[in-house]
Amino acid sequence: MTNAVTVKNITFQEGETLICVPLIGKTLDEILGNAHGLVDAGADIIEWRVDHFAQVREMAQVMAALAEIRGALKALPLLFTFRSKKEGGETELSDEAYFALNREAARSGLVDVIDIELFNDEAQIRALVDDAHAAGVKVIMSNHDFHKTPAQEDIIYRLRRMQDLGADLPKIAVMPQSPQDVLTLLAATLTMKEKYATRPLITMSMGKSGGVSRVTGRLFGSAMTFGTVGQASAPGQIAIAKLREVMDILS
């Protein structure tokens, strides 16, 4: 049995799968226009993909935008994510800028969760996790492989490593090259949940063929999935209304 993780008015826990919807836009006007459309869409949590924001390298502009987004989303929990280019993001930042951006967001009082990518300097990861927790912010630690699905043992190793580094919610997303790859991800999730997990997990197989992994989290052990209202942020994401319908049928 894993420990539940509560963020504002939602709880990540075994046997439940929450729906996260990405908020994407290059300009603040575009972002706010999209944000208003998400409030009534039925998402449990919103992820601002700040790597899509044209002014992401200007800290003051990011924080100003964040304040506007926080107001627009009302009570909805907010996940702050800068996705690096090597893991499927839109923009690249230096390591120094990446950690500074996330630290500022965590300390702002405007976000509820930040995303930290696993494949970074360990000392900087640990320091950022500590800063986030000191500010009352939860941490998703993530890894994304847009080219392949690693071996089951490797997926489990990465998720366990995230736990060891202090992640509240370990996350991995992988790309299948065959139906067997989808089964590999699901088997890794189930094994991790049953043998090693001390907290909720977030896992998915991407692309169209990986879609089954996005709707079976309650069965295999993924506590959050990603749906869309408009533009998707990763291949294989499903429109939120269809996603919830299928999840309800399967449950």
From Swiss-Prot:
Gene3D superfamilies linked: Aldolase class I
GO biological process, one term: aromatic amino acid family biosynthetic process
Residues the entry annotates as binding 3-dehydroquinate: E47, W48, R49, R83, R214, S233, Q237
Catalytic activity: 3-dehydroquinate = 3-dehydroshikimate + H2O
GO MF annotation terms: 3-dehydroquinate dehydratase activity
Enzyme class: lyase
Pathway: Metabolic intermediate biosynthesis; chorismate biosynthesis; chorismate from D-erythrose 4-phosphate and phosphoenolpyruvate: step 3/7
EC code: 4.2.1.10
Xref: SUPFAM superfamilies: Aldolase
Pfam family, one: DHquinase_I
Function in brief: Involved in the third step of the chorismate pathway, which leads to the biosynthesis of aromatic amino acids. Catalyzes the cis-dehydration of 3-dehydroquinate (DHQ) and introduces the first double bond of the aromatic ring to yield 3-dehydroshikimate.
Family according to the record: Belongs to the type-I 3-dehydroquinase family.
Oligomeric form and interacting partners: Homodimer.
NCBIfam families xrefs: aroD
HAMAP family: AroD
UniProt-recorded name of the protein: 3-dehydroquinate dehydratase
Organism for this UniProt entry: Klebsiella pneumoniae subsp. pneumoniae (strain ATCC 700721 / MGH 78578)
Record lineage: Bacteria, Pseudomonadati, Pseudomonadota, Gammaproteobacteria, Enterobacterales
Gene: aroD
